[in-house]
Amino acid sequence: MLLFGRIAAAALAMLAISAHAQTSPPADVSQDTKWHNDQMLYLVKLQRGEGWSATPSGLRYRRVKGDGSGARPSPTDTVTIHYTGRFIDGGEFDSSVTRGEPATFPLPRLIKGWQEGVPLMGVGDTFEFAIPASIAYGMKGKGPIPGGATLLFTIELIAIPG
């Protein structure tokens, strides 16, 4: 009887370990189906959100400051901006605001979401963008950004340098 008890206990332990392994998300979140679904669901919810607009590529945007009357950059311009990048859970992955210094970038060297979104802004405007992976870092990701991530940015367009 003692042997049967040990076998039963071992079997239950194996069953518990097996069940845990099947329900825990993979260490690489970019391969987790639920995680991917959450990324897309976030964008769908924004379609119904107050003040949000969408482009055919899936970029979501809204103006949070300014009136759009400032000069607008072309997709080939260099821009000076303040920005904060976050994941949909609110975690910040990059910010010129945190560093205390605006950044200057040529738009053609940036992700497609910025190439498409920043030219919608006028100097002095602040926009919020929700950028699907397809026009951000794709399914491979880059640095701290996992593949498939929807990225959220708050961007203030400061200048379009000569």
Give names to the regions the model predicted.
Residues 2-8, 12-15, 19-162:
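Cross-family detector of peptidyl-prolyl cis-trans isomerase
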